[in-house]
Regions:
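Amphipathic coiled-coil/heptad-repeat helices and related helical stalk/stem segments
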Residues: 61, 82, 107, 134-135, ...
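N-terminal membrane-anchoring alpha-helices
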Residues: 1-59
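Short, basic, glycine/proline-bearing loop/turn elements
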Residues: 49, 120-124, 154-155
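Non-catalytic C-terminal accessory region of glycerolipid acyltransferases
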Residues: 4, 132-243
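A short, well-structured juxtamembrane/interface segment
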Residues: 51-73
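Catalytic core of membrane glycerolipid acyltransferases/transacylases, capturing the structured
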Residues: 22-33, 37-43, 55, 70-128
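Short gly/ser/thr-rich secondary-structure transition/capping motifs
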Residues: 55-63, 131-132, 189-192
């Protein structure tokens, strides 16, 4: 319990003692300095997540960084099996990225503010209209030059293989005409969810970024089943992680 207590304690410390930035970032946004706000917030979150991962005992191996375009925002599409996916992935993405998250997370006030600072969005999958509005907003962020992350399974899964991907979530890339970077994540559940008693234990985490997918050049038939194609690539890549 010591490791997870340290992680949660540090996160609480971070959320409380960074409150002054709420007013600073709000003023920056009013003055048209949203990019400055994002860069500042992303750097602070990157550092905080790095500390949390160290406290949890995570050893992270990242492959495929060269596949990430340096001059273009992208939609990262990955599997989701642990709370630590978010920490490990954000810490591994150059410059960070906003996450499309379940609306349950918006119920935590201090966390909600910091998620907004790094352009995270909250989606209610039961409300079709709100869900579509979130997808359009995510696409707009991509057009504005901010990368985004989505987990098309819709929720965390501890099954050996990712659940089926919701194809509609990939419309974000189509609307923005932005490339997709598939992401395979392994080992994060070994940090927490696979352990009894909500205990964090040291584990090796593997993250692989796949080659960019240009959705504008895909035939309609391939685009229709793109989620399934990415899911299979993730399954195959995770097998390599575990070999």
């Amino acid at each position: 319990m010591i490791r997870i207590t340290l992680v949660l304690g540090y996160l609480f410390f971070f959320l409380v003692f960074t409150c002054p930035y709420y007013f600073i970032y709000k003023r920056w946004d009013k003055n048209g300095l949203s990019k400055k706000r994002y860069k500042s917030a992303a750097k602070k979150v990157h550092n905080a997540f790095g500390i949390c991962l160290s406290m949890a005992g995570a050893q992270i191996t990242v492959d495929g960084i060269s596949n990430i375009p340096k001059d273009q925002a992208v939609l990262y599409v990955g599997n989701h099996s642990s709370y630590f996916d978010i920490l490990a992935l954000f810490h591994s993405i150059p410059g960070g990225a906003g996450f499309v998250a379940k609306d349950d997370m918006a119920k935590i006030p201090l966390l909600k503010k910091w998620m907004a600072f790094i352009n995270c969005l909250f989606i209610n999958r039961k409300d079709v209209g709100q869900g579509m509005a979130t997808i359009k907003q995510a696409a707009q962020y991509l057009k504005d030059g901010y990368s985004m992350v989505i987990f098309p399974e819709g929720t965390r899964s501890q099954d050996p293989e990712p659940h089926e991907f919701k194809e509609g979530s990939l419309r974000i890339a189509s609307l923005a005409k932005a490339p997709i970077i598939p992401v395979a994540i392994s080992g994060t559940a070994d940090l927490l969810e696979n352990n009894p008693g909500f205990r964090a234990r040291p584990a090796t985490v593997h993250i692989t970024f796949g080659e960019p997918i240009d959705v504008t050049k895909l035939p309609r038939a391939e685009k229709k089943h793109l989620g399934a194609t990415i899911r299979q690539w993730i399954i195959d890549t995770r097998k390599i992680h575990n070999s």
